[in-house]
């Protein structure tokens, strides 16, 4: 079996929007982003080495976005749809980079192993390290927990700044036990797994895609974690109960949809952790939080990305 690859020379600013569009609207089999600065700058995490630099000499100055489709998919139609989407994003004032689109085909079995060379251990903190399942790694600290991950085609390994900002927020928030967490838009389940490793006792992972449900269940099993439940739903729709922590690493536009739902699902004294926010979109998030009775306790930044620790306003 072959895969059709659509490659777009673009920018970090739109990679998440393209990922969601490809998976949800075009039924892509998987997506991938390669960004040189993400790999080169990852050393800010305690000078840890994420990848060998020889492995990424072919990465772009900014971002290559790849979407993978069945070889029978209509290549020209997909290219046209991506072109239209790029112009739509440009109309929002976002940087779309060169927006050059190219296509190619690859044997499915070649892809299954070739892409793994780009991903290695992320020694995130004294509490957590992210370890792709094909890597051997011993904890760097006595109490360091390992998150074993099989990212597959559709979801990342935790090297993106937005994931790291969300994990920072979780490390700060999970200080008492027992504690319950809902991970909204879980993707590979990495934040839900991190919450479990940090001591959360009851965890719900939600997403709109079947692929995410499967990936989260498989990654939970890989880590021998049994306290993560998965639910296919849009944001917190159809979710029962309240939680001590709500964590969401998703696009700002989707966070704006989530904010009005949070009060009904957050325990008294609970915290919310947001990531995935481009700094240009922060004012809209701040305004919506204020209008819905929330305040920002902590702002975390990496490059153009912003993470937030949020609680209810005092009444």
Curated annotation (Swiss-Prot):
Output the superkingdom of the source species. Bacteria
Broad enzyme group: transferase
Q: What is its EC number?
A: 2.1.1.-
GO annotations under biological process?
methylation
Q: Write out the catalysed reaction.
A: L-lysyl-[protein] + 3 S-adenosyl-L-methionine = N(6),N(6),N(6)-trimethyl-L-lysyl-[protein] + 3 S-adenosyl-L-homocysteine + 3 H(+)
Which positions in this protein are listed as binding S-adenosyl-L-methionine?
A: 163, 185, 207, 249
Q: Which UniProt keywords apply?
A: Cytoplasm, Methyltransferase, S-adenosyl-L-methionine, Transferase
Signal peptide limits: none
**Major place of localization?**
cytoplasm
Q: Name one GO cellular component term.
A: cytoplasm
* MF GO annotations: protein-lysine N-methyltransferase activity
Q: Name one Pfam family in it.
A: PrmA
Where found, per UniProt? Cytoplasm
| Family as reported in the entry's similarity comment | Belongs to the methyltransferase superfamily. PrmA family.
The record's function comment reads: Methylates ribosomal protein L11.
Q: What is this protein called?
A: Ribosomal protein L11 methyltransferase
What species does this protein belong to? Lactobacillus helveticus (strain DPC 4571)
Gene that codes for this?
prmA
């Amino acid at each position: 079996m072959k895969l059709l690859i659509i490659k777009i020379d673009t920018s970090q600013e739109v990679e998440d929007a393209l990922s969601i569009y490809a998976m949800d609207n075009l039924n892509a089999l998987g997506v991938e982003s390669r960004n040189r600065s993400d790999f080169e700058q990852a050393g800010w995490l305690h000078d840890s080495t994420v990848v060998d630099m020889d492995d990424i000499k072919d990465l772009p100055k900014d971002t290559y976005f790849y979407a993978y489709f069945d070889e029978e998919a209509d290549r020209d139609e997909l290219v046209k749809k991506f072109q239209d989407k790029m112009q739509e994003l440009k109309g929002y004032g976002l940087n779309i980079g060169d927006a050059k689109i190219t296509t190619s085909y690859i044997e499915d079995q070649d892809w299954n192993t070739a892409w793994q060379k780009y991903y290695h251990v992320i020694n995130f903190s004294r509490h957590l390290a992210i370890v792709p399942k094909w890597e051997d790694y011993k904890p760097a600290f006595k109490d360091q927990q390992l998150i074993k991950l099989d990212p597959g085609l559709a979801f990342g390994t935790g090297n993106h700044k937005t994931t790291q900002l969300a994990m920072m927020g979780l490390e700060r928030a999970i200080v008492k036990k027992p504690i319950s967490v809902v991970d909204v838009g879980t993707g590979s389940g990495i934040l839900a797994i991190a919450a479990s490793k940090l001591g959360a006792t009851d965890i719900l992972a939600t997403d709109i895609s079947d692929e995410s449900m499967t990936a989260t269940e498989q990654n939970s099993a890989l880590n021998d974690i049994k306290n993560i439940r998965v639910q296919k739903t849009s944001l917190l729709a159809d979710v029962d109960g309240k939680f001590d922590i709500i964590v969401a690493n998703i696009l700002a536009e989707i966070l704006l949809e989530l904010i009005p739902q949070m009060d009904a699902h957050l325990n008294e004294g609970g915290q919310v952790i947001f990531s995935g926010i481009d700094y240009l979109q922060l004012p809209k998030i701040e305004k919506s939080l204020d209008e819905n009775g929330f305040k920002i306790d902590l702002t975390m930044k990496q490059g153009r990305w912003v993470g937030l620790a949020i609680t209810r306003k005092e009444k």
